[in-house]
Amino acid sequence: MQPDEKEIVKSELLVVTGLSGAGKSVVIQSLEDIGYFCVDNLPPILLPKFVELMGQGNPSLQKVAIAIDLRGKELFKSLIHEMDLIKSNSDVIVDMMFLEASNERLISRYKETRRAHPLNGNGQRSLIESINEERELLTEIKSLANYTIDTTQMKPKELRKRIGDYFNKSNVQTFNINVTSFGFKHGIQMDADLVFDVRFLPNPHYVDELRPLTGEDEAVYKYVMKWKETNIFYEKLIDLLKFMVPGYKKEGKSQLVIAIGCTGGQHRSVALAKRIGAELNESFDYNVYVHHRDAHVESGVKHKDEKN
């Protein structure tokens, strides 16, 4: 680089969409708090013009987040076409985040806020019908996202922390790996890219002194790891993940969600997720996060997110 040349830093655009009630407002507020210029409910047809403005070097538009939802139902249909257009702009880095949650959680949130669903403005259909229609309409949009977050088990504080972990950084492009334990009886991890079932492993639930503990406790961890089948499975899975992870990054994904499931999400999946997260953190120069979704549901112990 010549002395009088300045390094060109590309502007960044994050399009935030997803199911109504899944947390778009929390995400936009969180991004605004860390310095993003945020726009709520921009019609998709205006995206190319907005990206053109970003590419002109306006410092206030260096990092932009735009929330788009189905309130303008007919206008929303053009989003896929507009996303193809703006991703061809070499001056701006374009990402998409998709937020989702289970029907039960969305219904609960709507009952708490007493707001009408955007697809039920005339009040002539049930809430669940509106949610199901929206989920179907967004199926193709979801496939475009390189960030997908399932907020079913998240409180607003936890979602804000996740957004901060992802985006409160320098302009260096990063790759995030989320290793999540969960219990099948509480529902599958909806935003998972990879799901592994460890219910075939010996279960600490049937050991009286281990039953109230979680896989984060040393006694449970040692119990799960002492079995031959556990270690064979672990070694094979780590080999597979070390092969797959670079491929996901090469294909342009910004995050990879690996979900480890057992019956209740308290013992086996927690122990395996903890060990897998530690190994991936040692093996890759990426951000690795470990989250135990259901451990607190079964044990009564409040869970915490870990960053390796």
Curated annotation (Swiss-Prot):
List the HAMAP family hit by this protein, alphabetically.
Answer: RapZ_like
- Annotated binding of GTP, by residue: 69-72
> What does UniProt give as the signal peptide span?
none
The name this protein carries in UniProt is Nucleotide-binding protein SSP1952
**Record-listed ATP binding positions:** 18-25
- Extract the GO molecular function terms from the UniProt entry: ATP binding; GTP binding
Per the record, the domain of life is: Bacteria
Q: Which InterPro entries match?
A: P-loop_NTPase, RapZ-like, RapZ-like_N, RapZ_C
What the protein does?
Displays ATPase and GTPase activities.
Assigned protein family: Belongs to the RapZ-like family.
Alphabetized, the UniProt keywords read: ATP-binding, GTP-binding, Nucleotide-binding
Q: Which PANTHER family match?
A: RNASE ADAPTER PROTEIN RAPZ (PTHR30448:SF0)
